[in-house]
Amino acid sequence: MKVLNNLLLFVFLIFLVGSNVVNSTSQTWINQDVQRSIDVTTHLSKESISIKAKSLTDKNDIYQISFNSKYHVSIQALDSQNNELKVYLSPNSINIKEGFKTYNIELKNKVKKDEIVQLKVKVTSMIEQMIPYPSEIKQGQTQLVLYLNNHYFTSPYKTETQKTTVKLASSKVESYSEEQPTSLKGMTVTYGPYSAIEAFSVSPMRIHYENGSPFFVLTNLLKEYEVSHWGNLAVETHYQLENKGAHLVGAFSRLDYQRNPSVNPNQIAEVNEAVPLSATDFYYRDSIGNISTSSYQYLANRINFKIQPRFPLMGGWKNTFYTGYNLPIEKFLSVDTLTGQYHLNVTFGVGIDNVYVENHILKVVLPEGATDIKVHAPFAFTQSEENRKTYLDTIGRPVVVINIKDTASENYRYIQVTYNLSSLSIFHEPLLVIGAVFTLCIFIILYSRFDLSISKSKQI
């Protein structure tokens, strides 16, 4: 009996601590008004949230936002001046509310009590929210998608007023949930306005509609930059692509596809990637070899690199390939004249619209001898280092490895890698080549002066 009482006391204390965490969080801000605009015209849910919040405490510099723990999201936060704010998973996220992940948005300045803050949060998600329903279709059939969300803005704070608009891919809506007031006009579903919503209020949203967009997912993406102070910046990207839309059931007819390719809009027939205007020496290969069905088109501010796989990717199909090109090093690498430190500015991600990446790895191969390596990025990441030996290397080149889970095309942003490199390290490889050539010349000269014959020929 005593053991049971102790157990009940322990459970009560856990509940009390959890309640205190929620209460302390909800008493720091109040949402005066929230406007949510959700775009589900593709396979991604792109949510733009405008928040007007009032601080309830003094010296407040952390605003929190929560999401269903089942959803994998990519978050970007901006202040009223469009300055990007730091977003990271709250250290005590699991203790705030069960079933939710809570993220901290770090404000630029501390906020006084009763001061109003306006934020804009962009959220991109796909996993668990966009479900092909039915999960299997025949060639030529229309793909239907079930979209799941919350009628209310999921927040650890109370919300005075809020409204949500959902833009669909089609006006063909099979069904949709209703939390009055609710209206459907054409391709837009409007929920609200709602008033006096408590923290972590949940009302399941469910919209079943026609969406022919292919579920373009990169299960693994490896992008590699190789820096050469004597050459260029080589870029190579490895893709593991999968169409996670409604799976194709039955046989695939190439004849029907060639006759009318638009019948199956949920297929992936080509991939268009935006690359810098200065890119040259393009190549595109898969496990079989070079693929000639690729092209590039010069536009005003970029090159459109068009990649056409050997076959269209229907629902449930996968493909792997890699591409590459070269960039002039002087446009991406600069040196601080005061400190001698090198600054490399490159993009994280790939310039492909409406792409979702489950596992994203970026590698930066620096010159041999690089030291004091640091990475600066506007988002959280995990970092590790490798060593790679290639031509003319002695100790190997340092490789910076950056890894992020669940990213979207919105993560196509610049990161900076800084490092130091001595003059000896810069001239290391040219000196090796010069030394090798000089040694070879000396050897040839000495060899030509030695007489290695067994007997000297007699002169007549």
From Swiss-Prot:
Record carries keyword Nuclease: no
Record has Membrane as a keyword: yes
GO cellular component terms, A-Z: oligosaccharyltransferase complex
Pathway the protein contributes to: Protein modification; protein glycosylation
Glycosylation sites: N23, N290, N345, N420
Main location: endoplasmic reticulum
Membrane disposition: Single-pass type I membrane protein
Keywords assigned by UniProt, alphabetized: Endoplasmic reticulum, Glycoprotein, Membrane, Signal, Transmembrane, Transmembrane helix
BP-aspect Gene Ontology terms: protein N-linked glycosylation; protein N-linked glycosylation via asparagine
Cytoplasmic side: 447-460
Residues on Lumenal side: 25-425
UniProt-annotated location(s): Endoplasmic reticulum membrane
Induction entry: Upon infection by L.pneumophila.
Residues passing through the membrane, by range: 426-446
Signal peptide: 1-24
Family membership noted in the UniProt record: Belongs to the OST1 family.
Job description of the protein: Subunit of the oligosaccharyl transferase (OST) complex that catalyzes the initial transfer of a defined glycan (Glc(3)Man(9)GlcNAc(2) in eukaryotes) from the lipid carrier dolichol-pyrophosphate to an asparagine residue within an Asn-X-Ser/Thr consensus motif in nascent polypeptide chains, the first step in protein N-glycosylation. N-glycosylation occurs cotranslationally and the complex associates with the Sec61 complex at the channel-forming translocon complex that mediates protein translocation across the endoplasmic reticulum (ER). All subunits are required for a maximal enzyme activity.
Subunit (UniProt): Component of the oligosaccharyltransferase (OST) complex.
Name of the protein in its database record: Dolichyl-diphosphooligosaccharide--protein glycosyltransferase subunit 1
Species annotation: Dictyostelium discoideum
Source lineage: Eukaryota, Amoebozoa, Evosea, Eumycetozoa, Dictyostelia
